[in-house]
Regions:
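Structural preference for solvent-exposed beta-strand-turn elements
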Residues: 1-214
């Protein structure tokens, strides 16, 4: 029993895709008096195609399918690095998951999981936030312990505005500029421009001379 989610300034946070996916695995879910009531015996593997990509939806169905009976296919699954690492952790715990980072994830259910250890990947949203802060303040930054391969399209977008970026394997050098060019873009699922950096990019565009559209 959990309360229905709210939202934020960006918009509502519907959970319909989560519910549909879990019901496909055999969960019984109803909405009553502002709460989600869910129950199930052991979940049964199935195939579920997301109408649109959902990061947390993929994560929830992936975790549920891990202990479900039989095989589950998650089609149009999210490909974000965070989903890949979640799957890697589950595999380290005894799960049988294939197709991580691809459009279709296949899960063979197991009876139980055990403990495991994993090193969390660097936060790519925090990295972009720090990069933009450095550009806005016309400063120079050295950002360590990041993974530039997770940021290829955002970094290319930021280069277009006139900032200087130099990336190595786990490090990034940022140098601001007196002339920042306005940049327009559309947010997209990974590997595109993530929605979670549109606010930071909007702030960056406010110091440019010109018009931009997000």
């Amino acid at each position: 029993k959990v309360s229905l989610p709210g939202g934020c300034a960006i918009g509502a946070r519907p959970v319909d895709l989560h519910i549909q996916g879990l019901e496909k695995l055999g969960a019984r879910i109803e909405i009553k008096d502002g709460y989600l009531l869910a129950s199930a015996d052991r979940l049964i593997g199935s195939s579920y195609c997301f109408p649109k990509k959902s990061v947390t939806g993929t994560a929830n169905i992936l975790m549920a399918a891990t202990l479900a009976e039989g095989e589950t296919k998650i089609v149009n699954s999210a490909c974000e690095p965070e989903i890949v690492q979640l799957g890697e952790l589950l595999n380290a715990m005894g799960a049988r998951i294939e197709g991580l980072g691809e459009n279709c994830i296949t899960v063979q259910g197991v009876e139980n999981l055990s403990g495991a250890e994993i090193e969390i990947i660097p936060d790519r949203i925090e990295a972009i936030t720090m990069i933009i802060a450095g550009i806005i303040t016309k400063g120079e930054l050295k950002i360590e312990n990041i993974n530039p391969s997770h940021l290829e399209q955002p970094l290319e977008l930021i280069r277009q505005c006139g900032a200087q970026l130099e990336a190595s394997k786990q490090c990034l050098f940022v140098k601001g500029s007196d002339k920042i060019i306005p940049i327009s873009f559309e947010t997209e699922p990974y590997p595109g421009i993530p929605t979670d950096i549109q606010a930071q990019m909007m702030v960056l565009n406010t110091i440019t001379n010109g018009e931009s559209e997000i």
